[in-house]
């Protein structure tokens, strides 16, 4: 699975980068209407970097998988045409 970097705005309360609220992809801004699913990867394995995944639906009805890399504090999405 290939990912592309994104600019993401998040809901930050007691800690940073909790949930995505909007993101910009290829110059277009998308607003997250609903978080359909979330999961974590790499937290139990000290040899892997912790990653947070969010499957989201936008206001336009499109579905995206967003990923937050905790170490680099960067967001990306599954690359699709």
Go through the PLM ranges and name each one.
Residues 1-81:
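Cysteine-centric segments in proteins
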